[in-house]
């Protein structure tokens, strides 16, 4: 007999970055109970996990109904991922493009592992929806962010656990400007400001340099995508207001 999953409960993959913070707000707008899960896998930008507490505290001030919906925050340590991944996210090496056309920040299998662990936790807690911030519009080309990958994994998870999880990727077809716009739609300028100030995207874990779009080195692929999206979003917002 399969586990009973509650369709009004969601588990959000919440790293503390811009995308996952936006997905968390999206989930709070749609589900009755929302829990979060983050992963410590020896990443260089571990400061990202530290951002989660400030984001959660800030989200609770935006809408009264979100306070009651927010459930437990889970953190899983999976150091073995770093042990099998010789990448710029888990090693102190310069970020560069590889011969395969992927940046050396690609951690093979990372999202596959994250979603599988998330599903195992959701199964135990009776949570029917799993939400991730994967996107194949503005992204670095990671194959485990693609829609086809996530759908195939979702089918495998449901077969392997004899369940019917719903895997949601609300950012899949949004560029970074549209992701900023979604945050504005969900929580207004206060949510945009919260994500800008307290979410962390930079692969190098840089929190000393402040930019219009938030904190980061400004040079790594993640910072460049975030900055480009912010410029486009700001221009669109100014045009509407002007």
Swiss-Prot record:
Family annotation (SUPFAM superfamilies): Adenine nucleotide alpha hydrolases-like
Pfam families, alphabetized: QueC
Among InterPro entries, the record links this protein to: QueC, Rossmann-like_a/b/a_fold
Q: How is the cofactor bound?
A: Binds 1 zinc ion per subunit.
Q: Sorted alphabetically, which keywords does the UniProt record give?
A: ATP-binding, Ligase, Metal-binding, Nucleotide-binding, Queuosine biosynthesis, Zinc
Report the cofactors. Answer: Zn(2+)
**Annotated Zn(2+) binding sites:** 202, 217, 220, 223
GO BP, one annotated term: queuosine biosynthetic process
Q: Please give the catalytic activity noted in the UniProt record.
A: 7-carboxy-7-deazaguanine + NH4(+) + ATP = 7-cyano-7-deazaguanine + ADP + phosphate + H2O + H(+)
Q: In which pathway does it act?
A: Purine metabolism; 7-cyano-7-deazaguanine biosynthesis
Give the E.C. number(s).
6.3.4.20
Look at the named UniProt entry and state the broad enzyme category this protein falls under: ligase
- Gene Ontology terms, MF aspect: ATP binding; ligase activity, forming carbon-nitrogen bonds; zinc ion binding
Q: What domain of life?
A: Bacteria
Which residues are noted in the entry as ATP-binding?
A: 14-24
In terms of CDD domains, this protein maps to: QueC-like
Report the family membership.
Belongs to the QueC family.
Sum up the protein's function in the record's words: Catalyzes the ATP-dependent conversion of 7-carboxy-7-deazaguanine (CDG) to 7-cyano-7-deazaguanine (preQ(0)).
Return the protein name: 7-cyano-7-deazaguanine synthase
């Amino acid at each position: 007999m399969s586990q009973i999953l509650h369709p009004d409960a969601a588990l959000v993959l919440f790293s503390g970055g811009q995308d996952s913070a936006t997905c968390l707000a999206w989930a709070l707008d749609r589900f009755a109970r929302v829990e979060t899960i983050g992963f410590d896998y020896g990443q260089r930008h571990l400061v990202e996990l530290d951002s989660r507490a400030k984001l959660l505290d800030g989200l609770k001030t935006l809408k009264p109904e979100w306070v009651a919906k927010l459930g437990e925050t889970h953190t899983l340590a999976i150091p073995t991922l770093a042990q099998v991944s010789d990448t710029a996210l888990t090693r102190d090496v310069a970020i560069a493009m590889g011969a395969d056309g992927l940046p050396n920040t690609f951690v093979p299998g990372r999202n596959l592992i994250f979603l599988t662990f998330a599903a195992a936790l959701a199964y135990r807690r009776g949570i029917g929806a799993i939400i991730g911030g994967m996107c194949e519009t503005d992204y670095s080309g990671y194959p485990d962010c693609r829609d086809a990958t996530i759908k195939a994994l979702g089918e495998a998870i449901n077969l392997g656990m004899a369940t019917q999880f719903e895997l949601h990727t609300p950012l899949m077809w949004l560029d970074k400007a549209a992701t900023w716009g979604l945050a504005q739609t969900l929580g207004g300028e206060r949510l945009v400001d919260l994500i800008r100030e307290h979410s962390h995207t930079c692969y190098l874990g840089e929190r000393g340099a402040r930019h219009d779009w938030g904190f980061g080195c400004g040079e790594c692929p993640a910072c460049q995508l975030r900055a480009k999206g912010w410029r486009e979003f700001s221009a669109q917002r100014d045009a509407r207001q002007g």
